[in-house]
Amino acid sequence: MAHQTGIHATEELKEFFAKARAGSIRLIKVIIEDEQLVLGASQEPVGRWDQDYDRAVLPLLDAQEPCYLLFRLDSQNAQGFEWLFLAWSPDNSPVRLKMLYAATRATVKKEFGGGHIKDELFGTVKDDLSLAGYQKHLSSCAAPAPLTSAERELQQIRINEVKTEISVESKHQTLQGLAFPLQPEAQRALQQLKQKTVNYIQLKLDLERETIELVHTEPTNVAQLPSRIPRDAARYHFFLYKHTHEGDALESVVFIYSMPGYKCSIKERMLYSSCKSRLLDSVEQDFQLEIAKKIEIGDGAELTAEFLYDEVHPKQHAFKQAFAKPKGPGGKRGHKRLIRGPGENGEDS
């Protein structure tokens, strides 16, 4: 769930979106300026979409400034032309800008119209968002993907897990995934997290040894958390999130599974996904660590302070509290109205 920043499109940009959706525009560049989404640049089609792609997209990717690009394909769906949504966040741009653009990404798609967007890409270097990068993305998403013998074996393991007979004894063990053992250093780190002598743990899979290894336990605060997320490798993270909620000081353990998409091999994606549930079971049962929230991300810039708070304390909780003492309607009817408990099935008289 993407955190919303309160930034919205200007009326001029909304009008341009409407014009572009009709098919007269090949590319739209959107930037954040004065806390608003504004039109940065646009281009009309010259040739086929694949002929226009690199010459339209690549020159608009600034080495220092993030941006959003909407690129029109030649294919159509029921709503009209299909578009690619490209999120550009270069390595050299300031962390504050990266976080702002990551948190506003969902708003841009909503303002443009999510039904028009066929696919989306995220890039930190130009190769990520080039035509070759897009084709690589399509290849990685294609099903069935080409598998090595080891990957086919892993796939068969997962299929067999699905087919496991569900009985009273086995139903809680079905689909629990692969269990790579935690190395001693990783176990010690989890014990330290339970004792609150460390506040951050990063773990990785050793694919050759089939173990879960400790990467580091560097002290980390919320502001530093995005920088802990590798851009080119998957990781498991445990973070002791210290914050205040409704006047109470809390320390909540948050699990973060970071997977930077197609930058990882199919085997790596499958193994990290398959090992995750068994790792969490071990952490909660063997180490008696209560995990307040489990989050999956593709980019560290998503981990803003507000995003973490909203994940641990979803806003719907506030609505429940608001309805705890509803105001009765005016007039005599207000004195007769009852709020029934969850076990009562009577009807209003």
Curated annotation (Swiss-Prot):
Organism: Mus musculus
Protein name as it appears in the record: Twinfilin-2
Modifications the protein undergoes after translation, according to the UniProt entry: Phosphorylated on both serine/threonine and tyrosine.
Function: Actin-binding protein involved in motile and morphological processes. Inhibits actin polymerization, likely by sequestering G-actin. By capping the barbed ends of filaments, it also regulates motility. Seems to play an important role in clathrin-mediated endocytosis and distribution of endocytic organelles. May play a role in regulating the mature length of the middle and short rows of stereocilia.
Single GO molecular function: ATP binding
PANTHER family: TWINFILIN (PTHR13759), TWINFILIN-2 (PTHR13759:SF9)
Subunit structure: Interacts with G-actin; ADP-actin form and capping protein (CP). Isoform 2 interacts (via its N-terminal ADF-H domain) with G-actin (ADP-bound form) with significantly higher affinity than isoform 1. May also be able to interact with TWF1 and phosphoinositides, PI(4,5)P2. When bound to PI(4,5)P2, it is down-regulated. Interacts with MYO7A.
Predominant localisation class: cytoplasm
Location of the ADF-H domain: 4-139, 177-313
Alphabetized SUPFAM superfamilies for the sequence: Actin depolymerizing proteins
GO biological process: barbed-end actin filament capping; cell projection organization; cellular response to growth factor stimulus; cellular response to retinoic acid; intracellular signal transduction; negative regulation of actin filament polymerization; positive regulation of axon extension; positive regulation of lamellipodium assembly
